């Protein structure tokens, strides 16, 4: 049996919206393809390398927890950036997405330094962008989830897709997330992967390609995931009509 290793960073601080469900989805989806997933929880980064890592995951947290996580992850920002540039798949949620950028501006105007992995920034406001969200993606098809964030993120990189219902990165450009090489960043909770198996398969497939192990096409029953996604799409459509 082939194996993949996931590094789950700052799991003790960044799991505000049960984002651990994304790890469970990756593990279960891989199991259906006879791939064993080993999850390494990393809360202290001193001396950490990415030599044994195939996928990394960073969840979301409060502003306070995010600041603590940023400080800890800054110790490995150079190898993290190198891994991303080398094509390592990664999924970052909300705060985990925000602090990959250069800065985070609080509602009172205070600028907090990010990891600076990529050239973008986030500005937080007191009113939050909350509710169901539906996205149309050239790569993943229809994506659904739930968003709840005060941050407005701005960048010129590729995105997960176009927002057809909800807000996304901000309340202006109708774009959601970031898609840079094999790095995915998003504001979608839910968690995102159980309802969007296409993204789960993407991360696993890219990890297998990079490691040189087969990711063979296999008939998998996706009916439960499809039905769950349709429930959110239908609910969003009803909300559209009532506005």
UniProtKB/Swiss-Prot annotation:
It catalyses: beta-D-GlcNAc-(1->4)-Mur2Ac(oyl-L-Ala-gamma-D-Glu-L-Lys-D-Ala-D-Ala)-di-trans,octa-cis-undecaprenyl diphosphate + L-glutamine + ATP + H2O = beta-D-GlcNAc-(1->4)-Mur2Ac(oyl-L-Ala-D-isoglutaminyl-L-Lys-D-Ala-D-Ala)-di-trans,octa-cis-undecaprenyl diphosphate + L-glutamate + ADP + phosphate + H(+); L-glutamine + H2O = L-glutamate + NH4(+). The active site is at 94 (nucleophile), 189. Its EC number is 6.3.5.13, 3.5.1.2. GO terms for molecular function: carbon-nitrogen ligase activity on lipid II; glutaminase activity. InterPro entries: Class_I_gatase-like (IPR029062), CobQ_GATase1 (IPR033949), GATase_3 (IPR011698), Lipid_II_synth_GatD (IPR043702). It holds the Pfam family GATase_3. One of its GO terms (biological process) is cobalamin biosynthetic process. Substrate binds at residue 128. The keyword Lyase does not apply. Disulfide bonds: none annotated. It comes from the Bacteria. Residues 6-197 form the GATase cobBQ-type domain. Disruption phenotype: The gatD-murT double mutant shows abnormal peptidoglycan composition, with decreased amidation of the glutamate residue. The mutant has a normal morphology but growth rate is greatly reduced. Mutant shows reduced antibiotic resistance and increased sensitivity to lysozyme. Pathway: Cell wall biogenesis; peptidoglycan biosynthesis. Changing residue 189 to A: Abolishes glutaminase activity. Keywords: Cell shape, Cell wall biogenesis/degradation, Glutamine amidotransferase, Hydrolase, Ligase, Peptidoglycan synthesis. Belongs to the CobB/CobQ family. GatD subfamily. The lipid II isoglutaminyl synthase complex catalyzes the formation of alpha-D-isoglutamine in the cell wall lipid II stem peptide. The GatD subunit catalyzes the hydrolysis of glutamine to glutamate and ammonia. The resulting ammonia molecule is channeled to the active site of MurT. Forms a heterodimer with MurT. This is Lipid II isoglutaminyl synthase (glutamine-hydrolyzing) subunit GatD. It comes from Staphylococcus aureus (strain COL).
């Amino acid at each position: 049996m082939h194996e993949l290793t996931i590094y789950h960073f700052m799991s003790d601080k960044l799991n505000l919206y049960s984002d651990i469900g994304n790890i469970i989805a990756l593990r279960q989806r891989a199991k259906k393809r006879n791939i064993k997933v080993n999850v390494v929880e990393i809360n202290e980064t001193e001396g950490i390398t990415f030599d044994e890592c195939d996928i990394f995951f960073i969840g979301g947290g409060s502003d306070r927890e995010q600041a603590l996580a940023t400080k800890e992850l800054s110790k490995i920002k150079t190898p993290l950036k190198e891994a991303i540039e080398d094509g390592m798949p990664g999924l970052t949620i909300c705060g985990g997405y925000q602090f990959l950028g250069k800065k985070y501006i609080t509602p009172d105007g205070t600028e907090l330094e990010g990891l600076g992995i990529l050239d973008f920034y986030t500005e937080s406001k007191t009113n939050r962008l909350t509710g169901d969200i539906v996205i149309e993606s050239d790569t993943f098809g229809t994506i659904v989830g739930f968003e709840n964030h005060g941050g407005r993120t701005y960048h010129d990189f590729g995105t997960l897709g176009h927002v057809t219902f909800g807000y996304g990165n901000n309340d202006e450009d109708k774009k959601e997330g970031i898609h840079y090489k094999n790095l995915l960043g998003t504001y979608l909770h839910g968690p995102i992967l159980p309802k969007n198996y296409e993204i789960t398969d993407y991360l696993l497939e890219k990890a297998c390609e990079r490691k040189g192990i087969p990711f063979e096409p296999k008939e998998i029953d996706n009916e439960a995931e499809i039905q769950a996604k349709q429930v959110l799409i239908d609910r969003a459509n009803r909300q559209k009509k009532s506005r």
